[in-house]
């Protein structure tokens, strides 16, 4: 069973329960469930803006950031990394995009997990592969396609 730590560093927003976050993470891990450790941190806009500037060199807030763990050569570890999700942005995007809050939370948490697993969306073929997998994973939990 994966070790999934959920940290709440934000208040006042409708936030998912730790059990829901763990379920979404486990579902996105697929076959890597047994040996994995990761952290999901829910933050406010100030913390996310600071992280986005510091680690991506981009000003402003974003919805989710993933920080993969990169072990030293020869070191084997189940540590996958950290996912940081900005709760106010998730809530605002869900309303603007006409999605349920749970569906959008599930999507962004699983999106973060896929980044930790090595997926990216910087080039069209990679984006298509990642978005297709996200859609399949969400459908497996009863959520609609987030891209349609």
Language model features with spans:
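An acidic/histidine-cluster motif and surrounding catalytic segment
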Residues: 1-106, 116-148
